[in-house]
Amino acid sequence: MSTKSGDSKNTLYCSFCGKSQHEVVKLIAGPTVFICNECVELCMDIIREDNRTHLVKTRDGVPTPREICKVLDDYVIGQDHAKRILSVAVHNHYKRLAHAQKNNDIEIAKSNIMLVGPTGSGKTLLAQTLARILDVPFTMADATTLTEAGYVGEDVENIILKLLQAADYNVERAQRGIVYIDEVDKISRKSDNPSITRDVSGEGVQQALLKIMEGTVASVPPQGGRKHPQQEFLQVDTTNILFICGGAFAGLEKIIAQRGKGSGIGFGADVRDPTEQRTGAILREVEPEDLLKFGLIPEFIGRLPVVATLEDLDEAALIEILTKPKNALVKQYGRLFEMEGVKLNFTEDALKVVAARAIQRKTGARGLRSIMENILLETMFDLPGLDSVEEVVINGEVAEGRANPLFLHGKERAETGS
């Protein structure tokens, strides 16, 4: 029976984690054992993780677009349109690889992907989750650190080296991997007219990326390039590596709105301010000519035929991000507090304050952790030295810095019905 010696005979305990009925929301009784709601949730997570490795696959051995999208839903809130585009593009890419040796009369070209969306909207997380679903090597690169070969900075070939390292130097696995290049909007040339001066970190990098994105056999130095000139190089064919490029493209919405508005003047002109529309809605109308005007070269745009745009995250979406995903921030901090034997309780008002602050800072989901850290800093500093605290309540006033967190001890918690 799940009771402990010395305790009241009426107190029941979870047979798995040992928590009492007063420490958990629900205790479910079996014939001879009890299980709490927290252990049930943990079991569900284990089953979900196991199911993820047994995704429904087509005859090609590739997960279906619907299954890919379903797993993306577990980690990324909203962005349904972008998730559908990515799911289809990734499914087609790996289906193409599965059939590469079977039928050579028609060669299907590779479709690399461009993700356009505001900071903190989930571009990086989408790319990382895709690689995890497909169990392929994944690496990230920051376009702002890249320069043309021969200049101070990181060579484009270093991206392939990182992918090779992610594949434990298994060349065959690396050749089926995914590369995510962030901040590609920062390597746009400064105007849409070709420059007579050398642009080693802008147009020059775009030119250098073209080669590996289209498909080439790159000679990769296993120990890094410039410091070990005598080492033997590994040959990596980039033809089947999927490249996903992402960027915020600040100001692109104005270029799109200007194109849509035309050059009308006089009484019949459309004088609507583009800011009246949501940025995400405007970005969805993006055309190659807009990216060209932004500063990407035509050849680079041509290597990225699939364009997925992401929406701005509103307050409701940010609150969902804080609470719903498997690795949601509230769950992460809740687990940290559990390690101290304390339950963390964020009220709805507190979550609204956190979301509103992220919107005000224009940091999207990326800024949520920083805001949570600031709110919980003093609590996490004091808590390890406090005795008999069973629950910490963070409400709207605490989140705004106008009040101290509410520490509930055993007796107080029982009185409040927690």
UniProtKB/Swiss-Prot annotation:
Tree of life domain: Bacteria
GO molecular function: ATP binding; ATP hydrolysis activity; ATP-dependent protein folding chaperone; protein dimerization activity; unfolded protein binding; zinc ion binding
Keyword Cell membrane: no
InterPro entries: AAA+_ATPase (IPR003593), ATP-dep_Clp_protease_ClpX (IPR050052), ATPase_AAA_core (IPR003959), Clp_ATPase_C (IPR019489), Clp_protease_ATP-bd_su_ClpX (IPR004487), ClpX_bact (IPR046425), P-loop_NTPase (IPR027417), Znf_CppX_C4 (IPR010603)
Binding, ATP: P118, T119, G120, S121, G122, K123, T124, L125
Entry-linked PROSITE patterns: CLPX_ZB
Ranges for domain ClpX-type ZB: 2-55
NCBIfam families reported for this sequence: clpX, PRK05342.1
Cited function: ATP-dependent specificity component of the Clp protease. It directs the protease to specific substrates. Can perform chaperone functions in the absence of ClpP.
Summary of subunit composition and partner proteins: Component of the ClpX-ClpP complex. Forms a hexameric ring that, in the presence of ATP, binds to fourteen ClpP subunits assembled into a disk-like structure with a central cavity, resembling the structure of eukaryotic proteasomes.
Protein known as: ATP-dependent Clp protease ATP-binding subunit ClpX
Annotated source species: Acidiphilium cryptum (strain JF-5)
